Amino acid sequence: MEEVLEQLLAYGLYTGLIEKEDTIYCYNSLAGLLVFEPKACNEEHIKEEIKNLKTEERESGEYLEKLLQKILDYALAKGIIEDDSTITKDLFDTRVMGVLTDRPSNIRNRFFEKYSSSPKEATEYFYQFSQDNDYIRRYRIKKDIRYKVESPYGELDITINLSKPEKDPKKIALLGKTASHSYPACMLCKESEGYFGRLDFPARENHRIIPVKLSGENFYFQYSPYVYYNEHCIVFHEEHKPMKIDSAVFGKLFSFVEQFPHYFLGSNADLPIVGGSILSHEHFQGGNYSFPMEKSGLREEFSLEKFPDLHFGIVNWPMSVIRLNGKDKERCIDAASFILDRFRSYSDESLSILSHTGDTPHNTITPIARKRGELFELDLVLRNNRTTEEHPLGLFHPHEEWHHIKKENIGLIEVMGLAVLPARLRTELSNLGEAILENKDISSDPVLEKHYNFSQEIRKKYQNITKDTVEEIVRAEVGKVFLMVLRDAGIFKEDEAGKEGFRRFIASLS
């Protein structure tokens, strides 16, 4: 085991996680974690390992994955960990990487030192660090299926997320027998930095966060461990308080992109169904990525009397999006607040858009901010979370016919044109492709039956499906389902009635 620890220390030195002076300290700490009396650390062996380390192995995370697997095998054999479930192993190998992860104060000092030269240099450092210390598990991320599909709005991004660990049924059963916890209050709380974890809360010994001020309020910046797109970051409030879309949010989004102009930042909506999975803690998501919606041009331009100095338009997109931009940040915030206030109380019964049911509000906005040179830009995606008898999960939500592919909420990431699809689809779509090739009836298959209508449509549409083309065809059709999902979520549809309805709303802003 000494040799494996020396290889891990070589990795730590090579990546800059630790320095030469930390070697013996880390070696002893790791030996203590693994409960064995070590021989003296062989520093010559470490030097040799550093020479042999291949850049591509480091960058893919493969070298680290192999070392951690050896450590986990040892821990299991010695009874240090009780089983080989993903949850148990993740709790332990995160403790291991915590030994190689510097204290928060040092990481923050390094970040701001780099920031003083260049915000981009600072984020590149922090993103690389978050990968090197295994907070972002690159060897899992690369398992995700990612591809693009053509649409009338440009390319859409499709991902089938395989890197998020599946919940272990045995561990779920155990949870019912364990005491409930209130610390940390949620996975976004600042108190999760360095937290040791438990069955229902991932270990965070290698987790580091960077303080940022947004409109004078204290926030923290981190990367998502699941990286749905390049440099996928999360910016969360220092207090555990609910999401709320208001004029202050627009100011916070712009405050961030002013400080990090190479990143966008957006917020999920603040209502159930159209919001994200965490409404209890104010947070935003951003990153260094151009989404399909950002690349899409304007379908129509318009002006508002109150804001002659700003540009406005309707984005050519399946959802209902107003884009505004201008040089004056405060004017952009005022315009966005004005549109939000008007939309909160706006109804159009002819299009089934009702602002309230009794005292329950339905209208809100998903905002996304960017900096384009001197211009501040904001996309305002109009959302409504009404439910009906026919659509009990949401009228402007994926309709039931698409649930075989996507039934979860359409949050910020999907709104912008990136489908995050469940892991079950990897196997299901592969098996569906085989069934189509073999002309199998799947109507009574307990797993594939949900895809029956989808498969029939594919069979009708494509005459000559071969082993070489079936995967590409199924993937393209999944992309079309995602497009339909986005259309369902749009409140002003793309037919003439919908376009006229959108124009009526714009006219109401004058």
Question: Model segments located where?
Answer:
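Helical scaffold of the NTase/Pol beta-like nucleotidyltransferase catalytic core
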Residues: 206-208, 238-265
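Structured alpha-helical segments in the cores of large, soluble enzyme domains
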Residues: 219-224, 249, 253-257, 303-310
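Active-site microenvironments that recognize anionic phosphate/pyrophosphate groups
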Residues: 1-242, 316-318, 332-336, 342-510
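Beta-rich nucleic-acid/ligand-interaction surfaces
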Residues: 272-280, 358-364
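Coil-to-beta-strand transition motifs
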Residues: 61, 230, 262-264, 277-279, ...
